[in-house]
Every structure is written in structure tokens, then in C-alpha cells.
Amino acid sequence: MAPQGDDTVFQPKDAIKSGVSGALFSGGAGLLMASLRTSMKKNNVGSMHVFTHGGGTIISFTLAGGIYRFAQQASANLREKEDGWNHAIGAFLGGSVMGLRSLRFPVILGFGAMAGSVVGAFAFSGGLTGWGRDPNVDEFERKEAMRLNRRRPVEETLAEVGEGRGIYPPGYQERRRQRLLEKYGVEVKPVSADPNVASA
């Protein structure tokens, strides 16, 4: 189970702003869906066909996204908690809006219950961030601790990968010169790209 809530003071958020941004985002998704449906038509239709025949889809998506975000933030502000129940309440109301096109009450409740249960379970289990992650730990500090914990010594990396190809440990040039001298009998003189350093 994901950690639900914490001991910090709840900071209320602007529900209207969240609702408007959710409506714009989901309205764009509805416009994309209506555009895709229009582009799949076999007969040639005009550009306004997206709005005349896909207007219901665009409006449904816009209302569902706006109501979901508004209800989620409003319930969080009223309950003064940030948990999965807020997402479930918002998804229930947003899903009910998606069922309004059928004009049948059981369908409206079914869409709302399905959306609320799926989104609520998703949020309750931690969503995309995972159920085991502590919300009180800073993400940067967590990644730095993981890097320090899992960092391998340079000698081990060099033993597996080898030298060259951008990996130049101390003493690489001398070892390279020695290998070329032993293998091919060619002596390579050290050259520096720095004009201030005199070559030997």
C-alpha cells in the first residue's frame, strides 16, 4: 500500500485553475480524437467536419477533464488531505460526464463507478512513482544516495572495459608506447597539443 498522506501541513491548491488546465488538456485530447475519426472517413469531408460531427466528443472530453481536476483539487482542499480518495471522487464525476451522452442513468453511474474505481486504485497504489517510495525523501537526495551506494571502483571498470576508446587512466600513454614498441617495434614520441609545452 502506498503511503497515504503525511504529517506536514496541507497546502490548499487553486481548484479553478486546475479545472481550467485539465479542461484545456483533455479538450486538446478530444480534438485530437475527433480529428483522427474525421481523417478515417472514406468520403471527402471539409475541415469543419471535426467540429460539426466531432463536437460532442470534444465537449465530453473537455468537461470530463475539467470536472475531474476541479473535483479532485476541491475534495483535497475540503478534506485537507492528499490521497487516493480525491482522485476517486474526481474520476467518478469526470466519468459520469462521459456517460451523459447516453442519457441513461445506469450508464452514467456505470461510467462514473468504473472511472472512479480504476483511477482511485491507481492513485492509491502510488501511481507511476511506485508504492514503496517515501514522499518525504527528496528525489535528488535519493538518487545521490543510490549513486554513492552503487558506484563501482575505477579499477574494476577498467578491468572489464579496458583502456582506450575515451578511457585514459593515469599512465595510459606510457603503457601504450610500451605496447606499440613491443608489438610493432615502433617508438612513439610523446606529443602535446599545448603550444607552451616543448615536445621531447
From Swiss-Prot:
The keyword Translocase applies. It is an enzyme of class 7 (translocase). It catalyses: a ubiquinone + NADH + 5 H(+)(in) = a ubiquinol + NAD(+) + 4 H(+)(out). Keywords: Membrane, Mitochondrion, Mitochondrion inner membrane, NAD, Oxidoreductase, Translocase, Transmembrane, Transmembrane helix, Ubiquinone. It is found in: Mitochondrion inner membrane. It comes from the Eukaryota. One of its GO terms (molecular function) is NADH dehydrogenase (ubiquinone) activity. The chain crosses the membrane at residues 16-36, 48-68, 105-125. Its main location: mitochondrion. It is a multi-pass membrane protein. Its EC number is 7.1.1.2. PANTHER family: NADH DEHYDROGENASE [UBIQUINONE] 1 ALPHA SUBCOMPLEX SUBUNIT 11, NADH-UBIQUINONE OXIDOREDUCTASE SUBUNIT. This is NADH-ubiquinone oxidoreductase 21.3 kDa subunit.
